[in-house]
Every structure is written in C-alpha cells, then in structure tokens.
C-alpha cells in the first residue's frame, strides 16, 4: 500500500501592478483580481507571536527519515519525491528543538506514518466504508501489543511503520510515558473513525461536535507524547490528570485544528473536501471572510483559555514544576510548528505560502 500523498494545488499568486493616469492625475492602485480572504492576525498573536526555534539536527534527521520511509512504506520514486518536498521534518524540528538525532528521526517517521494512514480515511479506501475502516483501526492498534508478531513492510507497510515507531519508543521511554502514548494513539484512531461516521451524516456537525471530533483525529495528542519523550519530560500521571494540564493538551489540539482549517481552505475548495470548520460557519450564513474572522475570535478564545489554565496550575515542587514548564512550552511548540510548517510546505498553498504568511492574504479559486 503506497500512501496517497496529496498533490499540491497550483500556484495562484500574483501581484497587482499600479496603473498610472496621464500627467497630473493621481496614481490608482488596481484592486487585486479574484476572490481573496485576509487571514486573522490572531494566527500569530499571543503564544504564537514568537519565532520558532528549529532543531539544528533537522536536515540530518530529514535525510535519514526520507530514506527509511521510502523503504518502510514501499513508496515509488514519484511518491518519495513528493514526500520529501512536503518536509514534515521541519515541523518535527520545531516541535522538539532539543531532541537528539534518534528521537527526532522517530518523530519524522511517525509523522510519515500518520499522514499515510490518515489519507485513506479522508478520501480513499475507507472514507465510504465504516466497517472496513473499523477493521483497519483494530488491526493497526493490535500492533502496539508487545506480543504481536513483527510485521514486515511487504506484509503491510503502514502497520510495519507504526510498529517500528512503537518498538523504538518503548525501548527508551518510561512505563508511564508508554501508557500515555498508547492511549493517545488509541484516541487518534477512534477520532479517525468518528470522522468517517460524520462524513455519512445527512447534516453537518455543530461547531462543538466538530471541534471535539477534530481534537481526536487531528493527530496532536500523539505528538504531545512524542514531544514529552523528545524533550526528556516524565511527569507523574496524577499531575498529567490535573484539569489545567488536560486543558493545555486540548487547547493545543484546538489550535492545530483551527490553523489547519485556515491554511488548507484553498486546497479544500479545489479538491472538494468539506471537512473544514469554515464550511460549517458558512452554513450559518457567513461569508468566507466572516467565517475566517470568526476563527480568529476562536483563536483568541484559545489563548485566553491557555492563560487561565496556567493561572490555575498548582505548585508541585521544583522537579515536577520544571517538567511542567517544559511540557507547556512543548505544547506551544507543537502548535507553533504546525503553523509555520503549514505556511512553509507546498501541501496547502503550493508556492504561495511565504507570500501568504507575509501579507496574510490568500487567493481563493
């Protein structure tokens, strides 16, 4: 099975050129042609108003992962080139700026698995077959059992890749961290199934239902476990269960969801994909720009919830508090890495990402 990585949308950038009248008439600046939206300033506000720190091992880890994933996922040459250009390693390098090479490569490898695993549920083999989708999830999660036979790439590339990631994670992590990552992987797979179910509903989900569903399937929860592992964090489970710690994790998922929906909206329109909160808001009578502005308000609400959660954190003592600070920073870095990667990769905006980031303007088809 070869991952069906999404072909990038065509570049649609273009600068309007000033039009001059004769002699003394003032210069008139032509309005940009086409349908545009202005991304909300909230994308880069509050905890997102920082420049990301990039792991210096980023390019080395990318080269190693690109080669390994091509073999593990049985990519043909064309798919391998597309995957390399997506450059998921850039996101990993921001999510875990202090990780060693082995751990950073593990993050890249897992990101390779999750993108390849997710696509058939979005628009491929399992999107219209809930029974087959459930079977795939059951067989996939079974590979996390420590007594499961080793899966070869020829037998099943996706299960082989996840099992390899899990075995490497298990070798170097504590039992509590293993428990959390396995739990997060299960939550992700359940979220993917919920998304398949929503696609078969006659009506769109509410905003609350959509955000709950996306929190499970957006993939941020497993990233949090990998970030803990990469940054050397090992927080006791009773501390992780505190409402403020749970809130920080959930807000991270919400930030990633809203960032993704804004950055992928043009691609979604081009490809006819409607799993995006903007379509739900437009069903409520909003224009494209009004929906985007509403997402900006939702981002500001995320930042307020974040700071409220921090204010309600207890004090556990120097050792635990130090790890809690690293955890909070790591969760911020996950959202920060997702945001900067989304405007850096060609997956969503072709070659226009840097210009969209600079101007906050996105041209729609």
Swiss-Prot record:
Enzyme class, broadest EC rank: lyase
Biased composition regions of type Pro residues, renumbered to the chain: 1-11
Stretches for region Disordered: 1-20
UniProt-listed Gene3D superfamilies: Farnesyl Diphosphate Synthase
Location of the motif D(D/E)XX(D/E) motif: 118-122
Disruption phenotype: Abolishes the production of koraiol.
InterPro entries cross-referenced by the UniProt entry: Isoprenoid_synthase_dom_sf (IPR008949), Terpene_cyclase-like_2 (IPR034686)
Keywords assigned by UniProt, alphabetized: Lyase, Magnesium, Metal-binding
Biological-process GO terms, alphabetical: isoprenoid biosynthetic process
Residues that hold Mg(2+) 1 according to the record: 118
Motif WxxxxxRY motif mapped to chain: 341-348
Cofactors: Mg(2+)
Catalytic activities: (2E,6E)-farnesyl diphosphate + H2O = koraiol + diphosphate
Subunit structure: Homodimer.
Annotated family: Belongs to the terpene synthase family.
Protein purpose: Terpene cyclase that catalyzes the cyclization of farnesyl diphosphate (FPP) to the sesquiterpene koraiol.
Protein's recorded name: Terpene cyclase 4
Species: Gibberella fujikuroi (strain CBS 195.34 / IMI 58289 / NRRL A-6831)
Gene: Ffsc4
